[in-house]
Amino acid sequence: MKILWAALVVTLLAGCQADVEPEVEVREPAVWQSGQPWELALGRLWDYLRWVQTLSDQVQEELLSSKVTQELTLLMEDTMKEVTAYKSELEKELGPMAEDTKARLSKELQGAQARLGADMEEVRNRLLQYRSEVQAMLGQSSEELRARLASHLRKLRKRLQRDADDVQKRLAVYRAGAQEGAERSVSAIRERLGSLMEQGRLQALTSQPLRERAQAWGEQMRGRLEKVGSQARDRLDEVREQMEEVRVKMEEQAEAFQARLKSWFEPMVEDVRRQWAELMQKVQVAMGASTPAPSQKP
């Protein structure tokens, strides 16, 4: 009987040892702690999973209350959102890159993103499954469930790290392509500016005779304008002299006409004056003859 009990105990211990895998140390990605925003978000998710993997009393309590899965969902969404934002930022700088190369890099990065998202989703589903299994045990011992969960979490964290490293490498290739494209753009701009400066210098050299001809033409036009102005001033002086001559002639003609009028009317006036004087004299004489002489008293 004792032998049977001993065999049973050995079998149980062997089974427990088979279920619980030896814990393999997972390398902590220190680069996630200080890098791009998506790396910082992934670092927060990694730290949270490491805390969940401890399966402490607080962790188990929050697992049963769905708090862990809710927090994990927020961290997953934040991480994937930052990855997408960083990818979009790099894509804007990939202009000079060939379209086929850009399409290939984008496809590879999308695949890495999908694998990373699937890893996160599997972690969450495994935690939900653990919650359902614990609730189904109705107060019975859950040590075996915790052991299996710890084993799964170790495997999932290793897979998550592998796929996160893959995403990081793909983004590094993207970033290198963006930097190369930026350098090509700067080089093209420099070449273009150099070409424009050379063209400007050549145009300046070729435009020198044009400027000289323009200056000569301007001097010629200025001389012509001055000549025309001088001629106009001379003509104006001539017109003024002619007007003065006309005025003098008109004054002389007016004086001559006045003299002629005077010579016409003066004899007539004198004749009328003389006749009037004679008439008045006759009237006076006639009036004197008709007046009676005063009578003399004796």
From Swiss-Prot:
InterPro entries named among the record's database cross-references: ApoA_E, Apolipoprotein_A1/A4/E
Renumbered residue ranges of the record's region LDL and other lipoprotein receptors binding: 152-162
GO terms (BP aspect): acylglycerol homeostasis; cholesterol efflux; cholesterol metabolic process; lipoprotein metabolic process; melanosome organization; phospholipid efflux
UniProt GO cellular component terms: chylomicron; extracellular exosome; high-density lipoprotein particle; low-density lipoprotein particle; multivesicular body, internal vesicle; very-low-density lipoprotein particle
A Pfam family annotated for this UniProt entry: Apolipoprotein
Record's signal peptide: 1-18
Cellular localisation: Secreted; Secreted, Extracellular space; Secreted, Extracellular space, Extracellular matrix; Extracellular vesicle
Highest rank taxon of the organism: Eukaryota
GO molecular function, one term: heparin binding
Keywords linked to the UniProt accession: Chylomicron, Endosome, Extracellular matrix, Glycoprotein, HDL, Heparin-binding, Lipid transport, Lipid-binding, Oxidation, Phosphoprotein, Repeat, Secreted, Signal, Transport, VLDL
Start and end residues of each stretch annotated as Lipid-binding and lipoprotein association: 204-272
Entry keyword Metal-binding: no
Family assignment from sequence similarity: Belongs to the apolipoprotein A1/A4/E family.
Protein name from the UniProt record: Apolipoprotein E
Species of provenance: Dolichotis patagonum
